[in-house]
Amino acid sequence: MRLAILGGIAVTPERVIEDAGILIDEDGRISFVDTREQLEECEDWEDEIELGEKDVIMPGLINTHTHGPMTLFRGVADDMPLMKWLREEIWPLEERLDAEKCRWGAALAAMEALKSGTTCLADMYFFMDAVAEAYAEVGIRAVISHGMIDLGEEDKREEELKESKRVYRKCQGMEGLIEFSLGPHAPYTCSEELLKEVRRLADEWGVKIQIHVAETEDEVKEVKRKHGKRPVEYLDEIGLLGDDVIAAHCVWLDDKEIEILSKRGVIVSHNPISNMKLASGISPVPEMLERGVNVTIGTDGCASNNNLDMLEEIKVAALLHKVNKMDPSATEMLEILRMATVRAGTVFSSEKIGAIEEGYAADLVVLDGSSPRLNPNHNPISNIVYSASGSDVKHVFVAGELVVKNGKLVKADEQEILENSTECAEQLTSS
């Protein structure tokens, strides 16, 4: 059944179209984008949704780095540096996780993400088959990976690869919203043998790789001590890097590493709020963009953010580099929006996502034009980047299916998700 979305202001993001007309085909892809008048003149359809005159319709936001089930850890460990935070708080809690807890944590993440305008997540965590099932049921698109850490131990390496292969098999045949990827945690927690096997499997299976890179200065020192090179140089030397790699953080880079990231086509996920909260540093985003690196935006997990609101994240990303450079033009609003939409669409392989253009998946977000934050609307892109909040989200479509209607989930029971995720969180943190 073909669906027409009529009215509102469409931000594609390359064009702004007033009184828009968008047609979604039977496969959940966009088949027409223009004005309502043009749509009515040359197309027909079976169903339609009428938007308010001031409503803004935009591509769904793409969160290129997160750990969905960590919603269960929201507010548990704050105001700590990364390694202390991991070793004393997060890793001990993660030892108590199981598939059921990760499933409900992921359901909560999907609920929060969709209701704040995110339609796709790149997620690295544990019990990822359960996470994938939760994401599919709630209705969000996701690239999932089992986070692998071997610390140079052969038995642990085999165990991690076995789990990744199990999740890979489980994900085969899942509905098209879910894609599998490989997830070596970081160059300081993964052996060279594991990283080389990840590259071999990624080539064999045709899947993405997700990895944390150069998040802290201490990580850079540790990798240099072990391997004699900085993290990006080391990963390039062993053959891991390519345009199928999603490198999260990339805070502590030198000029040579930026050139390598550009040359290899690596997808960088900039996580400004998490990096600020953990005082990890400021990623050299303007320098990377200038040299052609594909920089995207992610939230990281809820334990270090502490939410999944990508509209908040893009505003912080826009502002952080202005003040860091003492230059208000250091980052421009359209480029920031691209980083969270069409640039980020490269994380998903089987569909074109991240733009309102013909042939792209109909992953769409409608912002409520009656929100005071969106009025007056002199510039819709400015309002999206600098004014909007996740609470302004009215409707969300994923693959042409309405999954949020008037701010409420359509496919899942919100109360059930809240009750079960809260119970799981209490079990984790009870002594």
Curated annotation (Swiss-Prot):
For the ligand (Zn(2+)), the binding residues are: H65, H67, H212, D300
Q: Which domain of life is it from?
A: Archaea
Q: What is its EC number?
A: 3.5.4.41, 3.5.4.31, 3.5.4.4, 3.5.4.28
InterPro entries linked to this entry: Amidohydro-rel, Deaminase_MtaD/DadD, Metal-dep_hydrolase_composite, Metal_Hydrolase, MTA/SAH_deaminase
The reactions it catalyses are: 5'-deoxyadenosine + H2O + H(+) = 5'-deoxyinosine + NH4(+); S-adenosyl-L-homocysteine + H2O + H(+) = S-inosyl-L-homocysteine + NH4(+); S-methyl-5'-thioadenosine + H2O + H(+) = S-methyl-5'-thioinosine + NH4(+); adenosine + H2O + H(+) = inosine + NH4(+)
Binding residues for substrate: E94, H185, E215, D300
> Which keywords describe this protein according to UniProt?
Hydrolase, Metal-binding, Zinc
Which cofactor(s) does the record list?
Zn(2+)
User: In which pathway does this enzyme or protein participate?
Assistant: Amino-acid biosynthesis; S-adenosyl-L-methionine biosynthesis
Task: Give a yes or no for keyword Metal-binding in this entry.
Answer: yes
Cross-referenced SUPFAM superfamilies: Composite domain of metallo-dependent hydrolases, Metallo-dependent hydrolases
Q: Return one Gene Ontology term, BP aspect.
A: S-adenosylmethionine biosynthetic process
The entry sums up its family as follows: Belongs to the metallo-dependent hydrolases superfamily. MTA/SAH deaminase family.
Q: Any additional notes?
A: SAH is a product of SAM methyltransferases and is known to be a feedback inhibitor of these enzymes. As a result of this inhibition, organisms have evolved efficient enzymes to metabolize SAH via different pathways. The pathway found in methanogens differs from the canonical pathway, it uses the deamination of S-adenosyl-L-homocysteine to form S-inosyl-L-homocysteine for the regeneration of SAM from S-adenosyl-L-homocysteine. 5'-deoxyadenosine is a radical SAM enzyme reaction product which strongly inhibits radical SAM enzymes.
Known partners and oligomeric status: Homotetramer.
Q: What is this protein called?
A: 5'-deoxyadenosine deaminase
Upper classification of the organism? Archaea, Methanobacteriati, Methanobacteriota, Methanomada group, Methanopyri
Q: Which gene encodes it?
A: dadD
